Amino acid sequence: MRQPIQTPIIGREDLGDLSRPEQALAQFYRGLNGRDLALLAENWEPSDDAAMDNPLGGIARGWPAIRALYERLFASDGRLWVEFHDYTIHGSDSLFYAVGRERGRFERSPAGLDLAIRTTRIFRRGGRRVGGRWRQVHHHGSIEDPALLGAYRQAVTPAPR
């Protein structure tokens, strides 16, 4: 059995040429923590094959639907920061999946939430790849605590203007 990696991926790691799974994961967290939709678009497969099952929006299929969820998150007046830890990476030359946990914080005045999310991400080479880079094709995240899930959903809903 593989031992989970405890050193977190936060998005500040060297992205190199994005040929290694850890680099693809770091690119994703750099885009998420930096609220960078362009970087997230580079990380995700830009086709209808992409799917995300996320605590915020049910199942989103295709990059346009996934992008809309990130736009909603980034439109809130809160700030999100997460890191990926306690993970294992499995795969082959054309596909890998990372299974682990995200921990982080969502700050929105006057309070914040500490987040704990079970996470799986799947990446592949092929399809609409560029230079052999990995593209994310699936994400599944689950918040186990129902109270935390409700508070997180409410917190990221943009305030009325």
Predicted segments — roles?
Residues 1-39, 51-161:
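A beta-strand edge to alpha-helix "cap/lid" segment located at domain peripheries
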